[in-house]
Amino acid sequence: MAHCNTLFHSMLNFIPRHQFAALENQHSTGRKFRNFSRWNQFTHLMFMQLTGRASLRDGIQSMNSRARDLYHLGAKPVARATFADANNMRPASFYQALFEKMYQRCRIVSPKHKFKFKNKLYSLDASVIDLSLGAFPWACFRRTKSAVKIHTLLDHSGFLPAFVSITDGKIHESKVAKSIRLAKGSIVVEDRAYTDYKWFCQLQENGIFFVTRQKTNAVYRVTERRQVNKNQGLCSDQTIVLTGSKGHLCPHPLRRIGYRDPETKKHYVFLTNNFTLSAKTIADIYKERWQIEIFFRWIKQNLKIKAFVGNSRNAVMTQIYVALIAYLLLCMFKYLSKISVGLQNLIRVIQLNLFRRCTLEELFEPPPHKKLNNNIYRQLEITFN
């Protein structure tokens, strides 16, 4: 009989151990755990994400009950206190670096975005995760609660998180946006919370395109008007120059597009520095920003990033980055296996079959059952008669 790894083992194999070890050497600060390796910690954290364990006790007990399977994963049982200490003391920067490495691997096999243009397309947004003020005082957000904010740049080629920064809930989105490095020719889509004319000017000068919604209090002067196809929902296509008190921060001409959604009848006004793509394409690009909202909703519903197994800042960041690595592993599993199933169904099936020895294709496309020989039925009839 041919040897077959468990699904969990197959997923972990997407992470080259030599790269894991190299990152481990680069982030070797903090307390040393002689009998609890970084790989062991990562394996336990990944198990909790993929199986939806509700607590530290639940996760450790469930994992330790699979001692035989742990051996084949290169891990071993661990005490709950040792695991908690490792999450608190081993720097989360290691898992951030591992997440970035995994994105680079996953983007190679991911499908391209749906648009005809070849520019890279990204959506930029942030999502708040509420925390208990008593348990997480370091993340104080308002008088009665704490929170952390996940700032994310979503790559529309495969809908992969390309950049993630985890901050306190008080940190404004635009502050993190300025730290993101994008390739020339990229298109980044964001909502009005990211309106910063100085940043828009920097993007323009670096050859990066942006698409956003114009603020209602924006002051500008129209310098050119272009005809539009109103049958496509377009209302206007103009070239403008900002003339308000902060207009000097972005002296470059911008493109202002009016659009009415034919389904919701809601009117939108978009602002961009791209004068090449059609006005309808710009409107469609902004509508695609909804994909990052879907991404946030998916990870909150299917991964463990709302209940934490540690209360320190380091433990919270570690758990979130491991959750994002789990998301990338699921995407990589899906794209390489080329199965036509959504991530929602994929993670549900994997949760039930994590330690089953089979391929992913066998779970969704099981081999046909062999037909029983008619002689067997005749023998059964003779036996009971």
Model-identified regions with their sequence ranges:
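Blade-loop segments of beta-propeller domains
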Residues: R66, L70-H72
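Major-groove recognition helix of helix-turn-helix-like DNA-binding domains
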Residues: L73-A92
